């Protein structure tokens, strides 16, 4: 499927989903075009860690291949572009702070070869040149442009339903109004007090309606999960319009995965967050739908306009495009106006609530799409806005969490007599809060007690293999996963940690074929 240039009119912009797990199979991805150099650029308000450079090991071959495929560029071009994008990300907040009211936006050029910064004075242009970017002298600063765009929302005319969206375009230094007629666009501009020369009009026949797979009382299994946060996860607000207390289910098991704590659809936001249900715990990773692989998430630093952008969703899976513009006010109808970022990545029904990623940085939550795989345009809710709004913290792949692992007869995994010597077989014991029971979950998949790793003795894989404590050595026999079903699985043996002979206190731990028995069920406390 080939996407046209994003300057072409897009059709049937719509919401794209109802909640579901990120492991549900979906349709093939589609291609995306080069970006329009237009957007409002903001410094990231999140507290995420600095992203790695373009050559980061986390940018694995599968992810790079998707960028090459969807953006139709070579591998060498992709690597060069990613390096430039990282430079733009670092420059953006620094220049915005240094230039203040002289700053009028930052974006990456259409050819992906230079960083362009809008400024209002020649003196500011010299600062931009010194920083290694290309200045463009314009009339209005970014603050002024944003105020003009905001006036459209505050002074909407009676026929606002015929206005699809509006945004700031720093490349032209104007506000762009997209509507189904010039008359509707002019009415919006007039109501906002915008004068000729300060705005542009784009005419489109779009009918913007909610089209997600949602019916009253259904399981919302048609959406996608975005990012884990501490204590829960994020998804789209229109996937949880029932609000606080609504139960969300996962298509991995068909069972409950979370309970909505807060949601908002309209008044600028399309997001929801739910508390984890039962034994479910999120990891700082996003699937890219290629053989079960994924991308480690290390923060939420915002990418610059013109940067590549990839999306993970249950329907179109892993698709990539460009970040076209920021702070687009999208009118979904029925009073639902949301401020989103626009990309040329493809998204369809069921992708709502999914994750947008730039390199190893979380960017946003899938909200809407034009539902046209021949002219891909999609919109996401910036994740930092949501994290700040509800005071949430993103779970990242670099985090280490410590807890007690409880199981059969409510006993905890335990090192006998706090003897941390190599080769000590682990047991279950009455939970007592000692260091012998504190298990740390590490990003590399190891589980550690007192700095040593849980280990399958001699890397054996047969039933009855002892689970012991050993110095960490990087072998796959020391990697475990605790899934939502409560199975603690050794990755090497693909067998479950099991309490031998269904023993009580002092029962030894071994690996055994997963059976679903109570002596193989574990949870963190």
Swiss-Prot record:
Coiled coil: none
Propeptide stretches in the record: 33-211
Domain of life: Bacteria
The protein's enzyme class: hydrolase
Annotated S-S bridges: 223-239, 310-320, 346-376, 412-431, 453-472, 496-514
Compartment(s) of residence: Secreted
InterPro entries: Pept_S1_alpha_lytic (IPR004236), Pept_S1A_streptogrisin (IPR001316), Peptidase_S1_PA (IPR009003), Peptidase_S1_PA_chymotrypsin (IPR043504), Ricin_B-like_lectins (IPR035992), Ricin_B_lectin (IPR000772), Streptogrisin_prodomain (IPR035070)
A Pfam family of this chain: Ricin_B_lectin
GO biological process: proteolysis
EC id: 3.4.21.-
Segments forming domain Ricin B-type lectin: 396-525
A GO MF term: serine-type endopeptidase activity
Protein name: Serine protease 1
Lineage of producing organism: Bacteria, Bacillati, Actinomycetota, Actinomycetes, Micrococcales
């Amino acid at each position: 499927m080939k996407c046209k240039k994003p300057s072409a009119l897009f059709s049937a912009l719509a919401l794209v989903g109802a909640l579901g797990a990120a492991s549900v199979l979906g349709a093939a991805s589609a291609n995306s075009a080069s970006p329009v150099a237009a957007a409002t650029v903001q410094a990231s308000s999140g507290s995420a860690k600095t992203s790695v450079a373009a050559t980061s090991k986390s940018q694995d071959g599968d992810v790079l291949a998707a960028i090459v495929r969807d953006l139709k560029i070579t591998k060498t071009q992709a690597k060069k572009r990613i390096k430039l994008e990282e430079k733009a990300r670092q420059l953006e907040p620094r220049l915005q702070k240094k230039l203040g009211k002289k700053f009028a936006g930052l974006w990456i050029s259409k050819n992906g070869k230079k960083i362009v910064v809008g400024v209002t004075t020649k003196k500011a242009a010299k600062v931009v040149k010194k920083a290694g970017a290309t200045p463009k002298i314009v009339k209005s600063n970014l603050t002024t442009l944003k105020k003009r765009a905001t006036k459209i929302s505050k002074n909407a005319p009676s026929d606002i339903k015929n206005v699809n969206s509006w945004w700031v375009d720093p490349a032209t230094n104007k506000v762009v109004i997209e509507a189904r007629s010039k008359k509707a666009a002019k009415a919006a501009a007039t109501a906002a007090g915008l004068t000729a020369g300060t705005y542009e009009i784009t005419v489109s026949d779009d009918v913007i309606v909610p089209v997600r797979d949602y019916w009253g009382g259904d399981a919302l299994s048609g959406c996608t999960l975005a990012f884990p946060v501490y204590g829960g996860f994020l998804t789209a607000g229109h996937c949880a319009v029932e609000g606080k207390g609504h139960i969300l289910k996962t298509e991995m098991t068909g069972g409950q995965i979370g309970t909505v704590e807060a949601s908002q659809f309209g008044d600028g936001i399309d997001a929801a967050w739910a508390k984890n249900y039962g034994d479910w715990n999120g990891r700082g990773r996003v699937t890219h739908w290629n053989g079960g692989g994924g991308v480690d998430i290390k923060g939420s630093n915002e990418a610059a306009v013109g940067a590549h952008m990839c999306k993970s969703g249950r329907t179109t899976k892993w698709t990539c495009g460009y970040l076209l513009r920021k702070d687009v006010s999208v009118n979904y109808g029925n009073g639902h106006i949301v401020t989103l970022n626009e990309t040329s990545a493809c998204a369809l029904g069921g992708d709502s609530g999914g994750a947008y990623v730039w390199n190893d940085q979380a960017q946003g939550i899938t909200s809407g799409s034009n539902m046209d795989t021949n002219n891909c345009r999609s919109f996401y809710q910036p994740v930092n806005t949501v994290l700040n709004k509800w005071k949430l913290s993103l779970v990242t792949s670099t985090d280490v969490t410590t807890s007690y692992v409880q199981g059969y007869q409510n006993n905890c995994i335990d090192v006998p007599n706090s003897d941390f010597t190599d080769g000590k077989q682990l047991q279950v014991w009455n939970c007592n809060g000692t260091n012998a029971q504190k298990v740390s979950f590490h990003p590399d998949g190891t589980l550690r007690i007192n700095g040593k790793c849980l280990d399958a003795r001699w890397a054996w894989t047969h039933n009855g293999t002892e689970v012991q404590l050993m110095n960490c050595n990087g072998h796959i026999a020391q990697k475990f996963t605790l899934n939502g079903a409560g199975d603690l699985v050794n990755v090497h043996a693909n067998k479950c940690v099991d309490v031998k002979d269904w023993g009580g206190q002092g029962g030894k731990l071994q690996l055994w074929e997963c059976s679903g028995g109570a002596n193989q069920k574990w949870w963190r406390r």
